[in-house]
Amino acid sequence: MAEITAKLVKELRDKTSAGMMDCKKALIENKGDMDKSIEWLRQKGIASAEKKSGRVAAEGAVGSYIHTGSRVGVLLELNCETDFVARGDLFQGLLRDLSMQVAACPSVEYVSVDQIPESIANKEKEIEMGRDDLSGKPDQIKAKIVEGRIGKRLKEMALLEQPFIKDSSINVEELVKQVAGKIGENIRVRRFTRYILGEGIEVQGPDFAEEVASMTLG
């Protein structure tokens, strides 16, 4: 029997998008054989999300999450293929987890990197190109550094790229694929909106001189 190493588990996970524990169990059950482990996961419905990705997901639900203190709220639309699945516990649990994820990640503004407008990417590039630590560097080196920084920044803005708040060993995209595999339907995060109490409202603070005067008189 082949040794079930972390590298082997990661390789299976990369090929199937299944969870780490599922991959480890599959490898143990199949004595480390990669092909048999992939087939085992497919039979269990864990590694089948990719095959379903081309099917239309027009059903689903809009979920909400209000954070403790009622200062942050999220609305998120999650799509699937049938109304039956949309009403199920797995789908509803995913909907709530994703809504919580958006509430916990204030820098996230888009579902995926692909949705980020080119104008935003260009603006980020402009900002990075102007940073002091790049001055004097050759253009080729500067371009590589900027490309890496922009890629990281754009990922920070995309929901699917975020580490899952309940299990940082996977990201949100992998979580969606895992649930899709278990459910047996294509699942797609379509859009979300975050509301922050008081956002955009200019609060007029007390006049400092008047505050000092009142304290002195008191």
Swiss-Prot record:
Residues 82-85 are annotated as: Involved in Mg(2+) ion dislocation from EF-Tu. Keywords: Cytoplasm, Elongation factor, Protein biosynthesis. One of its GO terms (cellular component) is cytoplasm. Transmembrane segments: none annotated. The keyword Cytoplasm applies. Coiled coil: none annotated. Pfam families: EF_TS. Gene3D superfamilies: 1.10.286.20, DNA helicase RuvA subunit, C-terminal domain, Elongation factor Ts, dimerisation domain. InterPro entries: EF-Ts_dimer_sf, Transl_elong_EFTs/EF1B, Transl_elong_EFTs/EF1B_dimer, Transl_elong_Ts_CS, UBA-like_sf. It is found in: Cytoplasm. GO terms for molecular function: translation elongation factor activity. PANTHER family: ELONGATION FACTOR TS, POLYPROTEIN OF EF-TS, CHLOROPLASTIC. Belongs to the EF-Ts family. Associates with the EF-Tu.GDP complex and induces the exchange of GDP to GTP. It remains bound to the aminoacyl-tRNA.EF-Tu.GTP complex up to the GTP hydrolysis stage on the ribosome. This is Elongation factor Ts. The lineage of its organism: Bacteria, Bacillati, Cyanobacteriota, Cyanophyceae, Synechococcales.
